[in-house]
Amino acid sequence: MNDRIYLTRDGYNRLKEELYVLVHQKRKEVLEKIAEARAHGDLSENAEYDAAREEQSLTEAHIADLENKLSTATILDPKQVKTDKVYILTSVKLRDLDKEGEIIEYTLVSSEEADTDLGKISVRSPVGRALIGKTVGEKVQIMVPKGELHYEILEIFVK
C-alpha cells in the first residue's frame, strides 16, 4: 500500500524517532530474548522462544510499516494551507446543533497524527470525511457509531 500520507514536520519527526527506537533498541532487546530462550534448550516446546519470535515478527512489521510511511510522506507547511475550505491541517470551529450550540474545535490531520485528547482528528474519520471541502456557514450531518451529529461550521483557520 503506497498511499501518500501528509504529515506536519512534528509528525514526521515523531515517526522518525519511533523508527529509531525500534531499530536501535527494541530490535536488540528482542534478539537478546531469542538468544536467552535458545539457551534453554529444545526449541520445539519452548514457549519463551515462540513468544520472542512472535515479538520479533511484530517488531519487524512495525519497522517496515514506519519505513513505508516515512518514504511516502509529504510534509505539509501550515503556512501554505488555505482556509477557504476545510482541508488537512486546518482547524475548524463548530457549533454543535444538538447540544445547545456548544462550540467545538478540531484540527484535521493524517491518521498517523490523530489524537482526540488534543482535538486532532483524522481526515479519514467520519467527522473528518464529512468536514473536508466544506466552507464557513455550511451545516453538516455526520453518521458516527453513537448516532448522528449535526454541526455548523463557524470558522476555518490554521494554528
From Swiss-Prot:
GO terms for biological process: DNA-templated transcription elongation; regulation of DNA-templated transcription elongation. Residues 47-73 form a coiled coil. Keywords: Coiled coil, DNA-binding, Transcription, Transcription regulation. The keyword DNA-binding applies. The keyword GTP-binding does not apply. One of its GO terms (molecular function) is DNA binding. Belongs to the GreA/GreB family. Necessary for efficient RNA polymerase transcription elongation past template-encoded arresting sites. The arresting sites in DNA have the property of trapping a certain fraction of elongating RNA polymerases that pass through, resulting in locked ternary complexes. Cleavage of the nascent transcript by cleavage factors such as GreA or GreB allows the resumption of elongation from the new 3'terminus. GreA releases sequences of 2 to 3 nucleotides. This is Transcription elongation factor GreA. It comes from Chlorobium phaeobacteroides (strain DSM 266 / SMG 266 / 2430). The lineage of its organism: Bacteria, Pseudomonadati, Chlorobiota, Chlorobiia, Chlorobiales.
